[in-house]
Amino acid sequence: MKKKYLSVNSNYVLYKTEELLDAASNRYKITVQIANRAKRRRYEDIDLLEEVTLKPIVRAVLEMAEEISQPEIISD
């Protein structure tokens, strides 16, 4: 069964990704953090019966970009 995802403006996602990378001191570390969050979210969403609205990687990028005002999350 193929999951249906909500369409998100790709330019907005790219902008938020660049915002995250600019704020991070280590690009590799923030990339790994995003991947781990997306992976964790993917396995959490398996248990949910409702439809998933965003792909896990996109959701992780957008969530972390929103949390950019909290520097302790990025500097971990």
From Swiss-Prot:
The keyword Ribonucleoprotein does not apply. GO terms for cellular component: chloroplast; DNA-directed RNA polymerase complex; mitochondrion. One of its GO terms (molecular function) is DNA binding. Its EC number is 2.7.7.6. Its main location: plastid. Keywords: Chloroplast, DNA-directed RNA polymerase, Nucleotidyltransferase, Plastid, Transcription, Transferase. It holds the Pfam family RNA_pol_Rpb6. One of its GO terms (biological process) is DNA-templated transcription. InterPro entries: DNA-dir_RNA_pol_omega, Pol_omega/Rpo6/RPB6, RPB6/omega-like_sf. Coiled coil: none annotated. It is found in: Plastid, Chloroplast. Belongs to the RNA polymerase subunit omega family. May be involved in RNA polymerase activity. HAMAP family: RNApol_bact_RpoZ. This is Putative DNA-directed RNA polymerase subunit omega.
